[in-house]
Amino acid sequence: MLKKAIFFGAHDDDVEIGCAGTAIKLKKKKFKIYKVIISSSGFKNEYGKTLRQNDIAEKEASRANKIIGFNECINLNEKTNEIIVNDLLKSKILKIINRINPSHIFVHWSGDVHHDHRVVSDLVLGLSKRIENVYLYRSNFFKSKKEFNGNIYIDITKEYKKKISSIEQYKTELKRVKNSWLKMVENENKINGYRSGCKYAECFEVIRSKIL
């Protein structure tokens, strides 16, 4: 049976930071891989200054998606930093899940400090009760009230360079954060690799995992 995995993210670049290595690895294992982004990903600061334009985010994401090799990418174009639970959004996500019928779903950790990440996590978890394999990832590493209970590590040593290349496509965001994301990802993946006996790894909190 053909295996399929959906990678959900609130914004363009979340999946790349949190689990691009795993996506690339699954693609090598003949999975069909899908990326679903909930927001348009452009945003302004508290003073109304545009920090990221929607069209630029879309172009950068397109380049990253090609590097990873997604079979299909979907953007639901909700407003960045204002994603809310509503029946229409639930319906859109459920239709995607039902159409693709994935064996695996990857989505944000529910304890994330970012509002959009938490909302997307809760939405997808609520709609994926029948999916056999569900994993939570982190796309930032800020301290939270909850502890991230990472309990599975995926060796991405061979996929690491391609993962970093996908993140590097988000030039506007990297410029804004002075490339700090790249070091953050390197440190996190190295630590996870050390913990699991390889050079680089991604860590996930397992909700469900069917081995046999």
Locate the predicted segments by residue.
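Active-site rim/loop-helix segments in enzyme catalytic domains that contact anionic ligands
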Residues: 1-100, 129-130, 206
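Metal-dependent de-N-acetylase/amidase catalytic core
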Residues: 2-6, 48, 72, 78-79, ...
